[in-house]
């Protein structure tokens, strides 16, 4: 199953609470922090909410 490498590249300060909650659900707390996550619909939904704050790449 493919996985997603998600990296927080922009600060969530000043953005709505739902976007901060999406980052928390992805496990991203600090700038430049990376997580490798399973590619599920729930993860994809959270990534799409904060697409302007993160960088995503598919990892096999």
Swiss-Prot record:
The keyword Zinc does not apply. One of its GO terms (molecular function) is structural constituent of ribosome. PROSITE patterns: RIBOSOMAL_L30 (PS00634). The keyword Cell membrane does not apply. Pfam families: Ribosomal_L30. InterPro entries: Ribo_uL30_ferredoxin-like_sf, Ribosomal_uL30_bac-type, Ribosomal_uL30_CS, Ribosomal_uL30_ferredoxin-like. Keywords: Ribonucleoprotein, Ribosomal protein. Belongs to the universal ribosomal protein uL30 family. NCBIfam families: rpmD_bact. This is Large ribosomal subunit protein uL30. It comes from Thermus thermophilus (strain ATCC 27634 / DSM 579 / HB8). The gene is rpmD.
């Amino acid at each position: 199953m493919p996985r997603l490498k998600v990296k927080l590249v922009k600060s969530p300060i000043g953005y709505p609470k739902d976007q901060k909650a999406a980052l928390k659900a992805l496990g991203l707390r600090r700038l430049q922090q990376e997580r490798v996550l399973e590619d599920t619909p729930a993860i994809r939904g959270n990534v799409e909410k904060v697409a302007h704050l993160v960088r995503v790449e598919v990892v096999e």
